[in-house]
Each structure stands twice: as structure tokens, then as C-alpha cells.
């Protein structure tokens, strides 16, 4: 059975190993090894063996499960920390004299017990003793130097062409609204209001306004518009229907001419031309196309 002196000596050795582990982490020396803690503690113990082996085995079973879980955690953390610990601050890989004097068991137990003691804040040389370890993606992105981030020059931020929304400077404006090509109530030019108006030779407009109307109305927006389209009748109605209906229109026209000539011939003979008789003759006539 262990005496209080053995317990105190083991605790003092763990504290001393923890301090040396912090110094080694600050120097950037990789000392993390995944040696089982149970075998290291059993071989390094200076006290007498337990009196009751069965009782000792029963009491260590829950602890062994916890140590196995901790060993898995240590192995995962060691894979994360090794790339950072392999880079020393000054490129000096020489060992400390105190590190050379320690036994291999102490070198294995010290980093393992320091991780079990929740001292995970001194793994990186650039971090302080009390700063938490940042393993998130945002912190890694924030730790990048500012020179690597893409920066835009003032020339790239500006647009390649002037915007039609922004106003030009007061010195560049040589005209007022009455001289601009858009129609409004303040126009002094006579004639109907239109968007396309012949420009005045004595006035010049804002280049921003010119660019706006050139994009909206085309390159030749200053040219006068042609006269509004008026309805022009070319040809006669007969020509129009002859082109549209063809032979059908000729048949209709012949039927109309025959119908109009029949009342005139009847009146010349002295026979009355009643409308009912005319309608009956039309209804029985096979040549009439309604």
C-alpha cells in the first residue's frame, strides 16, 4: 500500500514534469508521445506493490477505461499539434540539459500528464500560457497576413465608364435643363415636344447626359425625326379588292354590274321594276354570289 510520502513524491514529479513540458512547448520542441499512461505509471512508481492484487485490479478497471479514452484523445491532439511543434522559434533543435538528464519514461509521462491535466493552451509557441487554443476555421482565416488577401486598387474600384446616375461636377455643366434633349416644360425651343430634337449649335450639354441619351435612344438621337406617317391612299378600292380576292372580286363585280343593268333595261321597256321582283330574281339566280 502506498504511503502518503509516495503520493506526495509522485505528485511533485508530475508538477515538475508539467513545468518542463510548458518550457519545451514554448521552445517548440515536439515531446508529445502516445505512450500508455498506465504502464508508464506502474513502471515509474517507487512504492511497494499492492497487498491485495484482486482488490487492486478491481479498483483500477474504471480508471483503465478512462485512460484508454484519454490516450485516444492524446493521439488525436498530437497529430494536430505536431506540424506546429516541429517548427522551432529560432530553428535550434538542441535539447535542454535538463531534458537530456531525464529518463525516457519521464519524457513520455510529462507531455501525456500535462494533456490529461487540461493544459492544452501551451501547444503553440506563438500563444501565451493563458490563451485558449483556437482550432476553428475562422480563427485560422483571421490569422493570415493581410498581404495575402486580395486588395483592389483605386483604379479597379472605379467603373470603366461614367455612371449615368451620378451627377457631374458643376464646372462641367454648361447648360441647363432647357437645353437638354429631353422634353420638359422649360424648353424654349418651338415646335412639338419630342425626344429627338436637332441640337442647338450655341449650347453644349453635360457629357453624362449625352451618354445617357446615347445609350437609351441610339447614336443618332440628335437627328430630327421624320414626319409622322400619314395615311396615303394609293390606287382605288377596286385595285385593293382585286389584289385581295383575285377572281372572286371579278365575279362579284360582274354580278353587281348585271344586277344594276337589269332594272334599267326593264324600265326602258315600260315594265315596273319592283324591289320584290328584283329580290326574287336575285334569290333564284345561280350566278349571284352573296
Swiss-Prot record:
Compositional bias ranges of the Polar residues kind: 150-161
Compartment list: Nucleus
Pfam (any one): VGLL4
Highest taxon, organism lineage: Eukaryota
Annotated positions of the N-acetylmethionine modification: 1
Molecular-function annotations in GO: transcription coactivator binding
Modification sites for Phosphothreonine: 153
GO biological process: negative regulation of cardiac muscle cell proliferation; negative regulation of cell growth; negative regulation of DNA-templated transcription; negative regulation of hippo signaling; negative regulation of Wnt signaling pathway; positive regulation of protein catabolic process
One GO term describing the cellular component: nucleus
Ranges of biased composition (kind: Basic and acidic residues): 17-30, 92-105
Residue numbers spanned by region Disordered: 17-65, 85-106, 140-161, 254-290
Low complexity: compositionally biased ranges: 272-290
UniProtKB keywords: Acetylation, Nucleus, Phosphoprotein, Transcription, Transcription regulation
Bilayer-spanning residue ranges: none
Phosphoserine modifications at: 52, 149, 274
Family: Belongs to the vestigial family.
Function summary: May act as a specific coactivator for the mammalian TEFs.
Subunit structure: Interacts with TEFs. Interacts with IRF2BP2.
PANTHER family: TRANSCRIPTION COFACTOR VESTIGIAL-LIKE PROTEIN 4
Protein name in the entry: Transcription cofactor vestigial-like protein 4
Highest classification ranks of the organism: Eukaryota, Metazoa, Chordata, Craniata, Vertebrata
Amino acid at each position: 500500500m502506498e504511503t502518503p510520502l509516495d503520493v506526495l513524491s509522485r505528485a511533485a514529479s508530475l508538477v515538475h514534469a508539467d513545468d518542463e513540458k510548458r518550457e519545451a512547448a514554448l521552445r517548440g520542441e515536439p515531446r508529445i508521445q502516445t505512450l500508455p499512461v498506465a504502464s508508464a505509471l506502474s513502471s515509474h512508481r517507487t512504492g511497494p506493490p499492492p497487498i491485495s492484487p484482486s482488490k487492486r485490479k478491481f479498483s483500477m478497471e474504471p480508471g483503465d477505461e478512462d485512460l484508454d479514452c484519454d490516450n485516444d484523445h492524446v493521439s488525436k491532439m498530437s497529430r494536430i499539434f505536431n506540424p506546429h511543434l516541429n517548427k522551432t522559434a529560432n530553428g535550434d533543435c538542441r535539447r535542454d540539459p535538463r531534458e537530456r538528464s531525464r529518463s525516457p519514461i519521464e519524457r513520455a509521462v510529462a507531455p501525456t500528464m500535462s494533456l490529461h491535466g487540461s493544459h492544452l493552451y501551451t501547444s503553440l509557441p506563438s500563444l501565451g500560457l493563458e490563451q485558449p487554443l483556437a482550432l476553428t476555421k475562422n480563427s485560422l482565416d483571421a490569422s493570415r497576413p493581410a498581404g495575402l488577401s486580395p486588395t483592389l486598387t483605386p483604379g479597379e474600384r472605379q467603373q470603366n465608364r461614367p455612371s449615368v446616375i451620378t451627377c457631374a461636377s458643376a464646372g462641367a455643366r454648361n447648360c441647363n435643363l432647357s437645353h437638354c434633349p429631353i422634353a420638359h416644360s422649360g424648353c424654349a425651343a418651338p415646335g412639338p415636344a419630342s425626344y429627338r430634337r436637332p441640337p442647338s449649335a450655341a449650347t453644349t450639354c453635360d457629357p453624362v447626359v449625352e451618354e445617357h441619351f446615347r445609350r437609351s435612344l441610339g447614336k443618332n438621337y440628335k437627328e430630327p425625326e421624320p414626319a409622322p406617317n400619314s395615311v396615303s391612299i394609293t390606287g382605288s378600292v377596286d385595285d385593293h379588292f382585286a389584289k385581295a380576292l383575285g377572281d372572286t372580286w371579278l365575279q362579284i363585280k360582274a354580278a353587281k354590274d348585271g344586277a344594276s343593268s337589269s332594272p334599267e333595261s326593264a324600265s326602258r321597256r315600260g315594265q315596273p321594276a319592283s324591289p320584290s321582283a328584283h329580290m326574287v330574281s336575285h334569290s333564284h339566280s345561280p350566278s349571284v354570289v352573296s
